[in-house]
Amino acid sequence: MKKKINNIILKIDKFFYRKFKSDKSTKVLENIKEAKKIFSYINVPGEEDKIKFVGGCVRKAMTGEFIDDIDLATSFEPKDIKLKLSNKDIKIIDTGIEHGTITAILNKKKFEITSLRSDISTDGRHANVQFTSDWNKDATRRDFTINAIYSDIQGRVFDPFNGKSDLLDGKIVFIGSAEERIQEDY
């Protein structure tokens, strides 16, 4: 267990030695034209957003870093996402369909799209999941507060665990039990 914790601390140290620019906002995400297109195919006008940016791309937008990896979360199940994106100019790959993840490729840009989930049971990195439409349940299964920050295409943030504050303060805060989260990742 001590070795696992030390490995995580090394990764965290590398991450936090970067200089943060806290004046940046998630508004930059709306400038990613391929993301705009995906959002337009999935969201229903006049309804609550069904898809949001999540995790590293939101963190990087907040800190002014280059966004090289885009993860999206959606309240639709994978079969519904595949249907909504079919017959469009998007290539779809079943990356981890049993866990709710597909990869959408548009103009050579990859977007991992994962359905909102809650854990039924876990055994280390292997989890039996249930799809949900509850953003809070999905956030609860994430490892750190800084990875549970969501943003819609307009840059409006959903941050149920105050991850932005932790990010700007240079803190890594586990969601739930730190020991359980470490066991889940190894």
PLM regions with names:
Residues 1-186:
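Catalytic cores of the polymerase beta-like nucleotidyltransferase superfamily
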